Each structure stands twice: as structure tokens, then as C-alpha cells.
Amino acid sequence: PGATRPQYGGTLRVELRQNAETPDPPALLGGGFTIARWEAGRLAVYEADENAGGGRPFLGSVEFHLGRALRDQASDLDLGKADVVELGPGELRRQPAGRRVWSSSPVRVLALVFAPRYEDARVREALALAVDRSAIHTVLLQRQGEISGALLPQWLSGYAFLFPAAADLGRARQLAPGARPITLGVSDAAARPIAERIALNARDAGLVVSVTPQTANADVVLAELRIASADPAKALAQIAEALGLPAPPREASPNTAPNAAANASPEQAYAAERALLEGFRVIPLIHLPDVYGVGARVKGGPGIAPSGEWRFDNLWLEGARP
């Protein structure tokens, strides 16, 4: 019976892929912890706050180890060197029966993003129509997430289903003649099989696409963008900024408040997103959840909110020593 009673103390070890480009430490919801150490892109350590408003959390501290490959994370979880690790589709498939898995709502969008210099709108549209999202979702992603032609996920906007996501090879073949070869950059090795599948789809439409790990000079990049706000208009503006696209249009009038974007109606938000997607400079493919494998000594939880943010105030470690 004592094993299930919350215990104080112990260090929760979390491993993530986030790398040296990450400027800020992971955000924690719910309070209860203060950051004690931050080595940018490598390590973040949080200590329990004895004076937390909601009471001291059970965990003594939390360590985030960043820049860890998915395969290494899975190995560390199996060996008991980590308590919480990210799971890609391949790792999720290999999880032993009975292991707990935490999953958020779809909070990342996988998309093809063309370089500003790539001017041929017909070829951009041809590639958009050639991609077989369904095969990628079923085979490569093990049905994780949701197929979509929208930047914002359905749970957030309510209108994602209005953007077409079906392949149309016939139309793609009509647009493809005369297209020069395209380079598709993918920096994340875990996403390379998806890029290779897109190249195969493109070939079926008469396009020549070669996959490269170099993204700087690629014609188009397979990118992953995080939905960073629960407000549709704000989330859309942040995605546009991250992609270097013009800010989404909004109704302008002398009385427009500075935060008018945050108060946009669903119709305005839909129109703004449609404007961003016109011209096929960005081609949304699939919305993905954050998925984590959890070690046996972790109790309580889940430790993530539907928004994907961390929440450790209701976790404890079995066998922890205060």
C-alpha cells in the first residue's frame, strides 16, 4: 500500500531532442519549481520551491537533458537512466506492454516550406497535390496525429477540415511539365523517411525531387513548427513570423486595438490562414502530438497538459528519498 502513497524527494530525469538552438529552458505549468541551472541547449535543472503558493511539490528536482537522439532516449528509458523520454513513431511501436505513455493534443505541424527564391507557383502547387498524406500518416507515423491541409489543428481553430488535404495526381501531372529538379532539405534524421516518401510521391507526378540533409540552400524544407499559443490568431501570427511570411491580414480601422488579432472572429482567422496558404509557399501535411514514454517509478500525472506544456506539480517518484 505504501508504494502508491505520494512521496517527497528524488530527481525526475527528462530527455529531449531540443538542441543548442533552444534559447529558453522548457516552460513548466502550475508553478512549484524554480530554475536552478541552465546550460543553453544542453541542461535545465529545476528545484522544488519550498514556498510555492500551492504547496511544495513532491519531486525534489527535475533535470532536462537536451540534444538527445530518440534512439539514445529509448535506450536510457529501458536501462532506467531516464524517467521520461520522447517517443517517435518507431520508438512508440517498440514500447513494451504496460509502459505508460503521455500524449498531448496535436501541437506541432509538419509542413513543406519553400525558399523565398523559389518562384514557380505551378511546381509548388504540383508538389502540394502530389503528397500522399494518408500513406505517411498510416505507414511512417503509425497513425500518430491528424492529416491536415491547415496550419492550425482542428481542436484549436475549428475550421482545419475546410482546407483540402487529399492528393490529386492527375492535376499535379498537368502542372509538372517543364519543372526543374527540386532539392528537399530535411535536417532531422528521424524525419528523413517522410522526406523520401514525399520524393517518391513527387516522382509519380512527374517531378524530380532529391532529398538532402542540407537545408540552407534547399528549394523546399520539411519543417516542424510548434503551435505556441491557444489563441488561433496569435498562433497563426507566430507561425507566419517563424516562416518569414507576411503577417496574417486583419481588419484594420482607426479603432483597431493593439491586440485585435487576439480577438479575431473564426471567419477572420480562417481568412487570414487561407491568405497565408495561397501560393503554396507553405504546405501543411500533418499535425502531431508530443508523445512521451514514462518509467515505472514515475507516479501520478500525466506530466504534460493537452497544450504540450510540462506539469510536474502532481508527480512523485516511487522509492524516492526526501
Task: Place the predicted regions along the sequence by residue.
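Structural transition elements
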Residues: Q142, E146-G178, V186-P193
